[in-house]
């Protein structure tokens, strides 16, 4: 995931295990429990089908239980892209700016079922990875000769009930410049999809979408249905903290 070694990061299942331990301990002692999760991520399913969000919802519905999570500081990070493909469009281009050479980064593209998409990638020098045909569980790697950047593309169907599509794009030895991802509709109803880059702390350089969208930037698990999500504010003037949420 190219997360810098100096940044603390935890697996989702480890957080779930910690919540389970606290819930069990509170039940044994017959005590109320407030779970504060001062962590967040741009990764994973943003819907109600995400594993951590689902588990927190289950725990929070129990008597004497409450879960609180931060909404994150991604509002102005330009790490979210909202796509919309019209019926007459062959594809939509998504431009990603990499401001300096970096070890790598990744992008998660999510689409709600029954939407299905395929992608191609163009490098800053114009070299093209042709459209990778959609195949669930399929993976393809390509090395751009001039940039020496390795790009891998994974197609997955996720979730226990919904079967939403996830396209995972991984850029290793990412070269500076504008990278273009072309999104091709395979089966669409609304034509809507979302892309997310990692959180600021999870990248070792500045990378962002040129046509970013400021909505849907609350970090997981702050988007869970039964979790109280908290944002920041400016203590000097009482206004909202611009990066919050």
Residue ranges and their predicted role:
Residues 1-245:
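Loop-rich non-cytosolic ectodomains and luminal regions
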């Amino acid at each position: 995931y190219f997360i810098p070694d100096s940044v603390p990061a935890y697996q989702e299942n480890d957080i779930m295990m910690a919540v389970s331990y606290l819930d069990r301990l509170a039940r044994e002692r017959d005590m109320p429990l407030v779970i504060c999760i001062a962590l967040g991520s741009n990764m994973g399913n943003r819907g109600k089908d995400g594993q951590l969000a689902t588990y927190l919802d289950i725990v929070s519905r129990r008597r004497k239980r409450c879960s609180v999570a931060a909404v994150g500081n991604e509002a102005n990070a330009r790490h979210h892209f909202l796509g919309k493909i019209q019926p007459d469009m062959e594809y939509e281009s998504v431009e990603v700016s990499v401001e300096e050479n970096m070890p790598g980064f990744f992008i998660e593209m999510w689409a709600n079922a029954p939407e299905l998409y395929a992608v191609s990638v163009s490098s800053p020098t114009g070299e093209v990875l042709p459209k990778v045909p959609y195949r669930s569980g399929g993976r393809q790697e390509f090395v751009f000769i001039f940039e020496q950047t390795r790009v891998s593309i994974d197609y997955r169907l996720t979730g226990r009930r919904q079967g939403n599509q996830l396209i995972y794009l991984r850029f290793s030895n990412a070269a500076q410049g504008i990278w273009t991802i072309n999104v091709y509709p395979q089966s669409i109803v609304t034509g809507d999809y979302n892309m997310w880059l990692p959180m600021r702390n999870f990248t070792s350089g500045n990378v962002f979408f040129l046509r970013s969208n400021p909505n849907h930037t609350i970090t997981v698990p702050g988007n869970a249905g039964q979790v109280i999500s908290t944002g920041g504010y400016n203590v000097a003037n009482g206004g909202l903290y611009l990066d919050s949420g």
